């Protein structure tokens, strides 16, 4: 069964390229391309789409206002098509908090070439969005070429060696590692504000484009009792601090004596992502072993499944979010299937469990 899509963007170039690109996928039907939300609402009265690709800054009605109307009337998976600017990042994060499920970034210049180059990724974003459970999104917010073999999926081996079993854990200080993707921004905005300032240091990988993670960390910092910031190499992971992996970079945790410190580095995509949950989890397995708590939450794909198994084998406590509270039960399901999960919990229970751990 095909996925029906409505494109809403005031750029004629973006509308044209997205329409051509998505129409070329045999399982996607483009219902139309509207220059603003007013035209879009007229089209949606005729037939409601399965997925909406939505620009933010448009005439007559901005995308954020339109998104909120959609979520009030009939919650629908929305992919935000946002510019790579600081202002665009802030507004896009507001859109994710309001219920959007994913972000597509577009440059200010050469948009046609950029979108054509990213065709496979964008088509897959639409397919993934169609699987999102919008009832869960709303609840959390309120409290051929496309079928060609995928690009080689690298493992965390390309960034750091697997745990040897010979590591020395020279401290009893605890650390929390969290990995998430689709639906994760809403889940993190629910979970992290529940943590007290006395909780262990937290390292987070949220699949998100570069230039967005700094704004996301700032947003979380305003909501939380713990200090939240985008990770930089050398940052200490201490009690009451949460570090967010920068978009486009891998986040590792290493030891500096008895302390945990962040190591932010370039590298190839791992499990098709950068930052990769597998990389973070492996690094925590190596440096913290049984002193770590690993949490894998809502998201598409299998990033983190192998790393969580490595954390489990190193003695860490490992937790997966349950299907009912996930927007997409992909990453947690894969982690469970890999045998690396000790406990399966709702998002609410995960927050309660982590809030009870002291650094």
Swiss-Prot record:
Record-given protein name: Protein-glutamate methylesterase/protein-glutamine glutaminase 1
Location of this chain's protein in the cell: Cytoplasm
Its job: Involved in chemotaxis. Part of a chemotaxis signal transduction system that modulates chemotaxis in response to various stimuli. Catalyzes the demethylation of specific methylglutamate residues introduced into the chemoreceptors (methyl-accepting chemotaxis proteins or MCP) by CheR. Also mediates the irreversible deamidation of specific glutamine residues to glutamic acid.
UniProt record similarity statement: Belongs to the CheB family.
The record's account of how the chain is modified after translation: Phosphorylated by CheA. Phosphorylation of the N-terminal regulatory domain activates the methylesterase activity.
Domain Response regulatory: start-end pairs: 4-121
InterPro entries, per the entry: CheB-like (IPR008248), CheB_C (IPR035909), CheY-like_superfamily (IPR011006), Sig_transdc_resp-reg_Me-estase (IPR000673), Sig_transdc_resp-reg_receiver (IPR001789)
Entry keyword annotation includes 4Fe-4S: no
UniProt comment concerning the protein's domains: Contains a C-terminal catalytic domain, and an N-terminal region which modulates catalytic activity.
Predominant location: cytoplasm
Known EC number: 3.1.1.61, 3.5.1.44
Source superkingdom: Bacteria
GO terms under cellular component: cytoplasm
Domain CheB-type methylesterase: 169-354
UniProt-recorded Gene Ontology molecular function terms: phosphorelay response regulator activity; protein-glutamate methylesterase activity; protein-glutamine glutaminase activity
Coiled-coil regions listed: none
Pfam families linked to this entry: CheB_methylest, Response_reg
Catalysis: reaction(s): [protein]-L-glutamate 5-O-methyl ester + H2O = L-glutamyl-[protein] + methanol + H(+); L-glutaminyl-[protein] + H2O = L-glutamyl-[protein] + NH4(+)
Active site: 181, 207, 303
Residue positions where 4-aspartylphosphate is found in the record: 55
Alphabetically ordered keywords of this record: Chemotaxis, Cytoplasm, Hydrolase, Phosphoprotein
């Amino acid at each position: 069964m095909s996925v029906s899509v409505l494109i809403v963007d005031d750029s004629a170039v973006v509308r044209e390229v997205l329409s051509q690109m998505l129409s070329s996928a045999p399982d996607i039907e483009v219902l139309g391309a509207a220059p603003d939300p007013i035209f879009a609402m007229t089209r949606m009265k005729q037939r409601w789409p399965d997925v909406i690709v939505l620009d933010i800054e448009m005439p007559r009605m901005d995308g954020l206002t339109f998104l909120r109307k959609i979520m009030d009337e009939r919650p629908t998976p929305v992919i935000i098509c946002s510019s790579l600017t600081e202002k665009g990042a802030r507004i896009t994060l507001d859109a994710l908090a309001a219920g959007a499920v994913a972000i597509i970034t577009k440059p200010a210049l050469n948009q046609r070439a950029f979108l054509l180059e990213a065709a496979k990724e964008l088509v897959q974003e639409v397919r993934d969005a169609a699987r999102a459970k919008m009832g869960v999104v709303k609840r959390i917010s309120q409290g051929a070429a496309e079928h060609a073999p995928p690009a080689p999926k690298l493992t965390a081996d390309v960034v750091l060696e697997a745990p040897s079993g010979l590591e020395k854990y020279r401290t009893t200080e605890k650390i929390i590692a969290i990995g998430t993707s689709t639906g994760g921004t809403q889940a993190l905005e629910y979970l992290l504000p529940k943590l007290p300032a006395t909780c262990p240091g937290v390292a987070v990988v949220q699949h998100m484009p570069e230039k967005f993670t700094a704004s996301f960390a700032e947003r979380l910092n305003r909501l939380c009792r713990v200090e939240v910031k985008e990770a930089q190499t050398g940052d200490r992971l201490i009690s009451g601090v949460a570090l967010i992996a920068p978009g486009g970079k891998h986040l590792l945790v290493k030891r500096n004596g008895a302390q945990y410190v962040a190591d932010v580095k370039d590298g190839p995509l791992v499990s098709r992502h950068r930052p990769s949950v597998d990389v973070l989890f492996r690094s925590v397995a190596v440096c913290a072993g049984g002193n770590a708590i690993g949490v894998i939450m809502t998201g598409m794909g299998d990033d983190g499944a192998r790393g969580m198994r490595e954390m489990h084998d190193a003695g860490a406590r490992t937790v997966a979010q349950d299907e009912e509270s996930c927007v997409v039960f992909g990453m947690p399901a894969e982690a469970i299937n890999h045998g690396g999960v000790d406990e399966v919990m709702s998002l609410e229970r995960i927050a309660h469990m982590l809030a009870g751990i002291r650094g």
